[in-house]
Curated annotation (Swiss-Prot):
The organism of origin for this protein: Ruegeria pomeroyi (strain ATCC 700808 / DSM 15171 / DSS-3)
Record's catalysed reaction(s): a ribonucleoside 5'-phosphate + H2O = a ribonucleoside + phosphate
Recorded GO MF terms: 3'-nucleotidase activity; 5'-nucleotidase activity; exopolyphosphatase activity; metal ion binding; nucleotide binding
Name of protein: 5'-nucleotidase SurE
Top-level EC class: hydrolase
This protein's record includes keyword Cytoplasm: yes
């Protein structure tokens, strides 16, 4: 198997190194693992692409490249430059430092990379590590990905539905905020929403008197509805959510069509 890897935390991120080891086991002796990751931190950039300016790309190793762009840019660089002669069988994005459950998925550069791969017609999986009081500050923050990642990805691949040209499917995987030994299993769930908590802009003054803003996230430990990703994670389960690049609200569309 030929695998392309990217992330949004950057080429030197520990989560990327963990995913590279997972990918090497998945690829097998005859396979190849290629990495094209951002040269700098790209967290929160979503699915943005840098179509207004050129993107520098540098070789960091035999099959490792750093691109000065977003995760989606890196996927494009991998498909149309680095691996143009033989495209990958699978694209993996992560392992993100922090959860991409619930509404976080809408901001995530990690998911942006996977979504771009799906739009390009490839199988893609985004992987993220949820942190909380039970696993924060551990010696190996990505131990769950290393111990469970191969099994999780293989199970997803084994159940991947037959692809349709109009159905750009990818998967969002979140590892729970517990030690690896306490993971209870996998749950297939919907994307959730953390009610009453959201991003905000917090004003501050610099020592020189200039006004600036910090963007602050909401309460990441807040439980979402039963049967959704963050709820499963807080209960100790790896969440797996199938997604596709179609943001249509079908229920609202039906109501709108009935009145227009």
């Amino acid at each position: 198997m030929r695998i392309l890897i990217t992330n949004d935390d950057g080429i030197n991120a520990p989560g990327l190194a963990a995913l590279e080891q997972v990918a090497l086991e998945l690829a097998g002796p005859g396979g190849e693992v290629w990495t094209v990751a951002p040269a700098f931190e790209q967290s929160g950039v979503g699915h943005c692409i840098s179509y207004t300016h050129p993107m520098l790309i540098a070789r960091m190793g035999e099959r490792r490249f750093a691109a000065e762009g977003s995760p989606a840019d890196c996927v494009l660089a991998g498909l149309h430059d680095v691996m143009k002669d033989a495209p990958p069988d699978l694209v993996l994005s992560g392992v993100n430092r922090g959860n991409n459950s619930a509404e976080n998925a809408l901001y995530s550069g990690t998911l942006g990379g996977a979504m771009e791969a799906a739009l390009q017609g490839l199988r893609a999986i985004a992987l993220s590590q949820f942190f909380g009081p039970r696993n924060y500050g551990r010696t190996d923050p990505f131990e769950i990905a290393q111990s469970h990642g191969v099994q999780v990805i293989r199970r997803i691949l084994d159940t991947w539905p037959q692809e349709r040209p109009d159905y750009r499917l990818f998967y969002n995987v979140n590892f729970p905020p517990v030690p690896a030994a306490e993971v209870k299993g996998l749950r297939a769930v919907r994307q959730g929403f953390r009610e009453g908590t959201r991003f905000s802009a917090e004003p501050h003054l610099s020592p020189s008197g200039k006004r600036f803003l910090w963007i602050k996230g909401g309460d990441q430990q807040q439980r979402t509805a039963p049967g959704t990703d963050a709820a499963a994670n807080l209960d100790g389960y790896v969440s797996v959510t199938p997604m596709r690049a179609d943001l249509t609200a079908d229920d609202a569309l039906e109501a709108l069509q009935a009145t227009l």
